[in-house]
Amino acid sequence: MKYAIISDIHGNLPALELAIADAQANGADAFLLAGDYCTSAPWGSAVVDKLRALPNALHVRGNEEDYLHLPQGDDGQFQVTYWSSRQLRADQLAWLDELPHQVEFECEGVCVHMAHSSQAFIGNAAYERRPSRLAQLYPTGCVTREAFLADTRRTLDESPVFHEKLLTLPKGVYIFGHSHNQWHARFGDHLFINPGSCGINLDCAEFAAVYTLLSIENGECTVEERRIPYDAEALIAEVKQTEQYHAARVWTEIIFDEWRTCRDQIYFFLRHTEAFAQSIGDERRPFSVDTWEKSYEQWKNASLF
């Protein structure tokens, strides 16, 4: 049995279509979807329809699915969330609401567990591999897969929390996303798989539609990481023609920077905006439209030098 594992699509329909086509061309029998399907790219509604139509698929919900129910506000910070939720039909929202936070099943004697975040299984053991930290560890260039996987394994090896959690976990496969970086590691009878982010890969490598294939045969598991390069600038040009770009320009521009660099930008922009708001005595949170946009102009101008 071969599973295509896809996570963190974030409304990026072109990336999802590339991943699905590649998975089917490589003989995928079923799909495992690990959450965060909408918001950040403008095609969340089409993404949901595509996911609902997938044959032999299991889905869990991510943290972004919770934000879709935020009351519509007049702030700048959540403009993209408000816009994204308005694009979804009632039946799509209901489908997302019904998704479980965690699933498990057995295949050929192997127990497979899936949740959106690794915290469901190993606590904060992988926290040092969060996107903002990766951007600091690998500030420029493309990190090789060999180096990235070795660094990830070293982080887990050196984590007391990880080894404590490992003692409590039943043997099997553990699948999760959320951190937007693709990796897998085997520790004895435990196999951990993060398929990365299909829609916004932040693992300091090439821009690509990212997902992972898991094959289970006669109780044995093999993993193949898949990365399908495509044109970031062409995608950006397409997004600029959508309503989202005008409704949530600042957030969308930051996503463009993430696509161009394959590194976290949102975290650093939010830190910048917090400092900017404090400097002008603005205590409103979420940030107002005026503060949000002025902070972005300052951020953009600073990045030019």
Task: Put a short name on every predicted segment.
Residues 1-54:
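N-terminal active-site segment of His-dependent metallophosphoesterases
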Residues 186-305:
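Acidic, His/Gly-rich catalytic cores of divalent-metal-dependent hydrolytic chemistry
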Residues 23-27, 107, 167-170, 213, ...:
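Glycine-rich phosphate-binding loop signature in dinucleotide/nucleotide-binding domains
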Residues 6-7, 31-36, 40, 58-63, ...:
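Active-site neighborhood of phospho(di)ester-bond hydrolases with catalytic His/Asp-centered motifs
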Residues 1-4, 104-113, 187-192, 221-222:
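Beta-strand-turn-beta hairpins that frame and shape the catalytic cleft
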Residues 47, 54-105, 109-114, 121, ...:
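Active-site neighborhood of divalent metal-dependent phosphoester bond hydrolases
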